[in-house]
């Protein structure tokens, strides 16, 4: 019998595409949902029974009572943030009950220290006008600590606390040399970590072994990507990116799975484009359309609360992300946000000096200077948020979806028409 493969949900733009909602829908049929990269800089909103839950570090499947959730070795964990997230969501509704017995944390995952968050903010201030737009959650400094091999891992916290203390002091010393004004209450921090050690101990395990065991047992494993392709450290709009691998390759390094274990790759695409923070954004609209999308789409960051920049759907971005990730099906979200527009533009090419560019420019300067070629699609100017059948959509909305399929070469399987779990249309295969 062929071994079960994992399915993965990835963002194909600059994040905030609606990955959490698709994961939540798919988690109903999954046995396991796992995170493999990023930290609590991610923000996924899931609406269950009209209750809106915000997840940052917890996998979005945590709201399903029969679903195990895994935080893999590629994730960086801020333990105070984890427990704060649990408390906030538990106060909203009952869907996280029993979460401790279902959450598995990698012993190889790195710890985000409070000082990492302070350093993140200090580094951002140092940049002056060249700010990256970081969430200041300490993600970059934690991955930096990991790369220069003085990071603290969960297994360190599970071991001899005296050794953990020594390593912690070394990290403090390193950063205080770089940032003399950095203040760290060492005693308070160590006391807090002693408490967290006992809290998380029952959840900590070798998640690489665990995920392979799940697959051997033919469990249905769903992987939840954080951030998105255009925020990937290698393939995104560097340096305005995150510090981890948000693409399909991050699965192998962030969970310990071989490439042949990856089955379907579901790419999530917003029906228009948004990004938080600075960096190139060729289809950004600074006028009426951008303001409309921001207001109608409630485009504010889940993690930061910052206004998202808005613009037209960019198929150069989508096609680039589909190519890198081997996307097998697309989930097109927030189609209902376009309801009131008379004409809808889709970017189909970048040009420089009149010449069409074949790929995605690596240079931010080039990307900032490209001329964007659009196709115009007729709007439908009617409310589609209550529609649940593809054939019941206005013909113009159907045409928009089919155009995305045509331009990407990838079938659209789902359409999101609202924030609720039920506000999803299954798209029939193209005849």
UniProtKB/Swiss-Prot annotation:
GTP binds at residues 15-21, 43-45, 308, 334-336, 416-418. GO terms for molecular function: adenylosuccinate synthase activity; GTP binding; magnesium ion binding. GO terms for biological process: 'de novo' AMP biosynthetic process; IMP metabolic process. Pathway: Purine metabolism; AMP biosynthesis via de novo pathway; AMP from IMP: step 1/2. SMART domains: Adenylsucc_synt. Its cofactor is Mg(2+). This is Adenylosuccinate synthetase. It comes from Monosiga brevicollis. The lineage of its organism: Eukaryota, Choanoflagellata, Craspedida, Salpingoecidae, Monosiga.
């Amino acid at each position: 019998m062929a071994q079960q493969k994992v399915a993965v949900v990835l963002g194909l733009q600059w994040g905030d595409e609606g990955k959490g909602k698709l994961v939540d829908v798919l988690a109903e049929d999954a046995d396991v949902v796992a995170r493999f990269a990023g930290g609590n800089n991610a923000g996924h909103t899931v609406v269950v029974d009209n209750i809106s839950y915000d997840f940052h570090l917890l996998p979005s499947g945590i709201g399903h009572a029969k679903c195990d959730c895994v935080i893999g070795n590629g994730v960086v964990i801020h333990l105070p943030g984890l427990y704060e997230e649990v408390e906030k969501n538990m106060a909203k509704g009952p869907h996280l009950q029993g979460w401790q017995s279902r959450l598995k944390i990698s012993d190889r995952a790195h710890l985000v220290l409070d000082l990492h968050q302070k350093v993140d903010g200090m580094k951002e201030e140092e940049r002056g006008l060249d700010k990256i737009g970081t969430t200041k959650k300490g993600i970059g400094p934690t991955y930096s600590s990991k790369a220069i091999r003085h990071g603290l891992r969960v297994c360190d916290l599970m071991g001899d606390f005296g050794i953990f203390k020594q390593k912690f002091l070394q990290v403090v010393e390193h950063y205080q040399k770089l940032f003399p004004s950095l203040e760290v209450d060492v005693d308070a921090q160590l006391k807090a970590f002693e408490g967290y050690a006992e809290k998380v101990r029952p959840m900590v395990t070798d998640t690489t072994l665990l995920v392979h065991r799940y697959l051997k047992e033919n469990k249905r494993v769903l992987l939840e990507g954080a951030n998105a392709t255009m925020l990937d450290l290698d393939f995104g709009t560097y340096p305005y990116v995150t510090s981890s691998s948000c693409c399909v390759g991050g699965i192998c390094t962030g969970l310990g799975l071989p490439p042949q274990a990856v089955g379907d790759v579901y790419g999530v695409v917003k029906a228009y484009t948004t990004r938080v923070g600075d960096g190139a954004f060729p289809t950004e609209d600074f006028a009426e359309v951008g303001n409309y999308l921001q207001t109608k789409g409630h485009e504010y960051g889940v993690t930061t609360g910052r206004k998202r920049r808005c613009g037209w759907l960019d198929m150069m971005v989508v096609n680039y992300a589909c190519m890198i990730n081997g996307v097998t099906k697309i989930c097109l979200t927030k189609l209902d946000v376009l309801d009131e527009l008379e004409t809808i533009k889709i970017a189909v090419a970048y040009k420089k000096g009149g010449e069409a560019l074949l790929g995605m420019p690596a240079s931010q300067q080039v990307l900032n200077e490209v001329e964007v070629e659009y196709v115009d699609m007729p709007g439908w100017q009617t409310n589609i948020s209550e529609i649940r059948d593809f054939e019941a959509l206005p013909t113009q909305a159907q045409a928009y979806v089919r155009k995305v399929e045509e331009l990407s070469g990838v079938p659209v399987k789902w359409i999101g028409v609202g924030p609720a779990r039920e506000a999803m249309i299954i798209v029939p295969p193209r005849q």
